[in-house]
Structure formats: structure tokens, C-alpha cells
Swiss-Prot record:
PANTHER family: SURFACTANT-ASSOCIATED PROTEIN 2
Signal peptide: 1-19
UniProt keywords, alphabetically: Cytoplasmic vesicle, Glycoprotein, Golgi apparatus, Secreted, Signal
Organism listed in the record: Bos taurus (Bovine)
Post-translational modifications reported in the UniProt record: N-glycosylated.
InterPro entries tied to this protein: SFTA2
Ranges that cross the membrane: none
Location relative to the cell: Secreted; Cytoplasmic vesicle, Secretory vesicle; Golgi apparatus
GO cellular component terms listed in the entry, alphabetical order: extracellular region; Golgi apparatus; transport vesicle
Record's protein name: Surfactant-associated protein 2
Glycan-bearing residues: 37
Gene: SFTA2
Function: Putative surfactant protein.
């Protein structure tokens, strides 16, 4: 990818299923090399689920990875 834009992981914590409650967004910049080999296969969603566990995120937390031209999304189910 070279000098492409950095990957940014956005975590949105929603207080209710309708999104009407309080929320928080956390932005993390990740190295392209960390996800370069897994960004287009099914193990990438497993990576996001493990990220939920690592950060002890509450059930229903929306995790989205934004990259130039695409995004991946998972809802924490822990």
C-alpha cells in the first residue's frame, strides 16, 4: 500500500439498541502492516471480535474499521 492513508478503527458505544442513549467514539490508528494480509478474508472479522474481548467492550458495541474505499463492521457479541 505504500503511502496510503492509515487505517482507523472507530468504536461506537451505544447506550440502547435504538441509538438514542449516550455514545462514545474512539479512534485508533493502526499500522497498515498489521492488517495487510487479513483485510480481505474472513479471519479479519475474527480479529475485530477479539478486539472486543481485549478492550472488554460491552455487548452490542459497534466496531467499524474504515480504510480508503472500504469498511468492515462487526457488533460485539461477548
Amino acid at each position: 500500500m505504500g503511502a496510503g492513508l492509515p487505517l482507523v478503527l472507530l468504536l461506537t458505544l451505544v447506550g440502547s439498541s435504538q441509538g438514542a442513549g449516550p455514545g462514545m467514539t474512539l479512534q485508533l490508528k493502526l499500522k497498515n502492516s498489521l492488517l495487510a494480509n487479513s483485510s480481505y478474508n474472513s479471519s479479519f472479522l475474527d480479529f475485530l471480535q477479539k478486539f472486543c474481548l481485549l478492550l472488554h467492550l460491552p455487548l452490542g458495541t459497534n466496531v467499524t474499521l474504515h480504510q480508503a474505499g472500504s469498511s468492515q463492521h462487526v457488533t460485539c457479541r461477548v
